[in-house]
Amino acid sequence: MTKKTVRVRFAPSPTGPLHVGGVRTALFNYLFSKKNSGKFILRIEDTDSKRKVDGAEDYILKCLSWCGIDIDEGPYRQSERKSLYQKNISLLIKKGNAYFAFDTEEELKALRSESEKKGETFVYNWQNRKSLKNSLSMTAAEVEKSLQKKKSFVVRFKTPKNKIIKTRDIIRGSTSIDSNLLDDKILIKADGTPTYHFANVVDDKEMEITHVIRGEEWLPSLALHTMLYDAFKWAAPSFAHLPLCLLYTSDAADDFTS
């Protein structure tokens, strides 16, 4: 059997200067690719145009070059891959793993407030889907009418009910979580752009990424990403979530010792 070429990616958002933690993540990816005679890919995650900073991408490229981190492929830009996300979200909806949700932000805010008064947390999932405004509770004719009228909507992932989601991380080991505790995450926002979670999984599949090496702030997202791979019936890459770089300060040290 032919051994699969190692392919890793560094995927910063052009929202400002590249910080030390980002450079460290890039370095881990770069060194892992070189150790395994693989490819280091740069992907610019720029779907959030409101947060995009002019010149940030050039700054990222200069920083990587200054650090001696050579790019084998890229930079790829998510803003130039919208048709790919539309194709895959249509596939996911057709498979029954995602759905249109027409609830307004005001309506959801009211539901959250109502839950808070009861000492509860509002979670949009299998427990209340049928009572909310979405393509799972509406008739096909109602959904079509809403789409034709161009009513604002998002596309949500249909989190499976009563399922133990098992995940595997190279650093953290195996974990599991009850799907009933999870919400139906938004995959496509009201403006038509993909969320980080959806674009991330689609891009990693299309770019044939074998190892996802990223900061541990993304560890809570691993269950969702695992479910997305399962829904598409795609083989998931190996995951490694790196401990964060924390700033040492005298105040922090005093708090710790006290």
Model-derived features: positions:
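Hydrophobic transmembrane-helix microenvironments that flank and shape a buried ionizable site
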Residues: 16, 181, 251-252
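N-terminal Rossmann-like or analogous alpha/beta NTP/dinucleotide-binding catalytic cores
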Residues: 2-121, 191, 220-234
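Single, functionally critical "micro-switch" positions that shape active/binding sites
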Residues: 18, 95, 202-203, 253-254
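Active-site cores that bind ATP or allylic diphosphates and position pyrophosphate for catalysis
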Residues: 94, 100, 104-241, 246-247
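Single conserved hydrophobic/aromatic residue that forms the stacking wall/gate
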Residues: 248-258
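Short intrinsically disordered, low-complexity segments
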Residues: 30, 197, 256-257
